[in-house]
Amino acid sequence: MINIKDILKITGIFPILAYAEPDSAAPAAKALVEGGLPVLEVLMRDEQAMNNLKRILLEVPEITAGAGTILTLDQAKEAIDIGAKFIVLPGYHEKIVEYCIDHDTLVVPGCVTAAELMQAYEHGIEIVKFFPVFQMGGIETIQMLSGPFGSMRFMVTGNLNGENFLPLLRCDKIIAAGGDWMFQEQDALKNRDFDQISRNLRNSVMRVQNMRCLKK
């Protein structure tokens, strides 16, 4: 199993599956593997999302898949029970964080204030979700928060697309930008064009690498 933190540092991208028909979820996940980034967050925003995650975990064992938009402890327990490798929260939920830690499951809580970051720091968390990134002040806010929390790394999300995600990664405190643009561009997922999903992803990863080379 890959180390999520390591691959995020390399690619800077965190694919998020917001919605998929049951027969498209696993092929979409497989497309990420083919595109070279075997990580996927499945958002728990509809009734079939948990089943989609379960199907992905069973049918695409080479991907590291987890559950996002987890709001309750019961949801977290169910996701971990079916094999979720990580849990992503929109905000900070102490009971969920502690449950994940007790069950050796990576947890990425949402933190946009110093108070929330204090809680994350106390629990030994190294990566937090910063959502919604633009509405909460973007890079400027993250840089200010990084003063006292220099070791913390931020995964930014919120209406990101294939264009606006890239400038965010110029901030070294941002470990990755999360979004579903690789599924949405050219209506790839809607059209079940899984090869296009792979191409979209490879193109985004290449742009990140090119940007980083120019910075050196």
Predicted regions and their residues:
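Glycine-rich phosphate-binding active-site loops on the catalytic face of alpha/beta enzymes
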Residues: P90-I96, K129-G138, K173-F194
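Active-site phosphate/pyrophosphate- and oxyanion-stabilizing loops and adjacent acidic/basic residues
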Residues: K54, Q143, L166
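Catalytic cores of alpha/beta
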Residues: T72-I82, A115-H123, E140, L160-A176
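Glycine-enriched alpha-helix->loop->beta-strand junction motifs that scaffold or abut catalytic
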Residues: V33-P38, E59-E62, I80-I87, D102-V108, ...
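Structural motif corresponding to alpha-helix initiation and N-cap regions
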Residues: M1, D46, M50, L73, ...
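Conserved N-terminal beta1-alpha1 strand-loop-helix module at the mouth
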Residues: M1-I82, D102, K190-L214
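Glycine-rich beta-strand-to-loop/alpha-helix junction loops that act as flexible
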Residues: A67-G68, V156-N159, A177-D180
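Catalytic beta/alpha-barrel core
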Residues: I16-A18, V39-D46, I63-L71, A84-Y92, ...
